[in-house]
Design a protein with these regions (language model features):
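N-terminal helical cap/lid subdomain that shapes the substrate entry/recognition surface
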Residues: 3-104, 114-117, 126
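Anionic-ligand binding region
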Residues: 120-121
């Protein structure tokens, strides 16, 4: 049976971006002058995306509003996606083989579409 299509997650699968995502919470706390406990730091690296903002505000005491945190996430990831993001090692060769075989490829991500398009372009894989 021949592979006809493939769906890829973007962050951490196509792109080497997870370290940047993981450092956002701790960076925000440092900027607000808050020292995270080792347990809080561990939790920030393991929580689901939807749980990070409430955790930063309610448990860690980050004084920013939910919207301020969201705006900061978008701004910082846009900067990263515009200039620093790279594809995972070996990805371009793999995608080129799939393309050559006529496999339809799709990206599934929770990241905003504008940022997704920017990231894929910067990483040089938007043409797949």
């Amino acid at each position: 049976m021949r592979l006809q299509s493939a769906i890829f997650d973007m962050d951490g699968t196509l792109l080497d971006s997870m370290p940047t995502w993981r450092e956002l919470g701790p960076t925000f706390l440092k900027e607000a002058g808050i020292s995270a406990t080792p347990e809080q730091d561990r939790m920030l690296h393991t929580l689901a995306d939807c749980d990070v903002i409430p955790y930063l505000r309610e448990v860690c005491g980050l004084p920013w509003s939910q919207q301020e945190i969201i705006d900061q996430i978008i701004q910082r990831m846009e900067t990263f996606y515009s200039s620093q993001v790279r594809p995972k090692p070996g990805l371009e060769k793999f995608l080129s083989i799939l393309k050559m075989e006529g496999v339809w490829m799709y990206v599934a991500t929770a990241t905003h579409r504008r940022l997704t398009e920017k990231a894929l372009k910067t990483a040089g894989i938007d043409h797949y």
